[in-house]
Amino acid sequence: MNPNQKIITIGSVSLTIATVCFLMQIAILVTTVTLHFKQHECDSPASNQVMPCEPIIIERNITEIVYLNNTTIEKEICPKVVEYRNWSKPQCQITGFAPFSKDNSIRLSAGGDIWVTREPYVSCDPVKCYQFALGQGTTLDNKHSNDTVHDRIPHRTLLMNELGVPFHLGTRQVCIAWSSSSCHDGKAWLHVCITGDDKNATASFIYDGRLVDSIGSWSQNILRTQESECVCINGTCTVVMTDGSASGRADTRILFIEEGKIVHISPLAGSAQHVEECSCYPRYPGVRCICRDNWKGSNRPVVDINMEDYSIDSSYVCSGLVGDTPRNDDRSSNSNCRNPNNERGTQGVKGWAFDNGNDLWMGRTISKDLRSGYETFKVIGGWSTPNSKSQINRQVIVDSDNRSGYSGIFSVEGKSCINRCFYVELIRGRKQETRVWWTSNSIVVFCGTSGTYGTGSWPDGANINFMPI
């Protein structure tokens, strides 16, 4: 090859390499521009598809940086659309309950500014669990805490903190309320808050931090609600409310709410004679509630809510080991599934239970007469067999020498099933402990487990002699 041919060959190869490099740079530039300007194509609808007019809630918007040959490419990850909860997964199969949370509010009140509360409960959004309670408008070490044994005053407010965080001075006051219920529909919180005169109270419906609707007393006799979480399925939330006598016939209605707006009201139907303070849980496609009969029965009423056609049915828990306090001893207590047992039916306490096939998981005070101690167990046939009394898997939550109080259920959705959890109110102060002038509580929380577990007792634990008077 002569010198001229060598020069031509080298030039051709160099030109080819330069051309390839140039084309590669153009390709990289085109890719960068295309990725940057095609963000709108994330989850883009098919052609001619009608898009909804309402806004779509975006949970997060993350930019991922990819480095390629010293060239930065920004790739927009498609945002996640927040959806309504439907609770369609099966209920978790459990062997019992394991400790989950305890806030120690009364013990902490001995040396800190902690709210005076009662009627606590727990509810969860899709990410976190929160504890709620009705505050008395005062901290414990405060003269305003005197005589806080009373249920209904205009200063009571609904408090909300992350579960396990006591109600300190920085706690958010969600609304004015001496009776309440809260639940999260998957997009935002709904709070049902009742306050006002005993004979003409108002229930406010607050959704996503805004007052959306309200309803006044319909029987002019202490309008009241669950004191535990409501339940939302596919954007419709339901809450049980009662107005009328606490020891005679009352008017119970089941309200259906969508994004804070009342869309339907159904009267109570079925055989339940008196219904208060229901503990409700999702039982897809409906909702089931275990309530308090403060008139005729120490066996607990059951309210079944059809979320599709708004129909209601009611009955009583079949278990002959009844759940209310006061009650007969277990040898003489009864329940026939349909009617109140007329056994020490007046008075009572908020409680919970839930069905497990034909069986029943339930909790109750250990004392049959007082709000003392707390136990859980499973009743074989307790959901389907009248007067069933075969008990297994008993656990002591609070020993019988210590005070308890209200209790209620809340549900937590896992990857494959829905777990049932419960809380126990641990009341301290008046009326039983007369050294002090206040009445308040702490809580302990347990959740269902498929594992093994040990034993113990988890009372409030405050030494009343250390407490402010």
Swiss-Prot record:
Keyword Coiled coil assigned: no
Residues on Virion surface side: 31-469
Topology in the lipid bilayer: Single-pass type II membrane protein
Cofactor: Ca(2+)
Composition skew (Low complexity), residue ranges: 333-342
Top-level taxon in the UniProt lineage: Viruses
Misc. comment: The influenza A genome consist of 8 RNA segments. Genetic variation of hemagglutinin and/or neuraminidase genes results in the emergence of new influenza strains. The mechanism of variation can be the result of point mutations or the result of genetic reassortment between segments of two different strains.
Record family assignment: Belongs to the glycosyl hydrolase 34 family.
Protein name from the UniProt record: Neuraminidase
Lineage per the UniProt record: Viruses, Riboviria, Orthornavirae, Negarnaviricota, Polyploviricotina
The encoding gene: NA
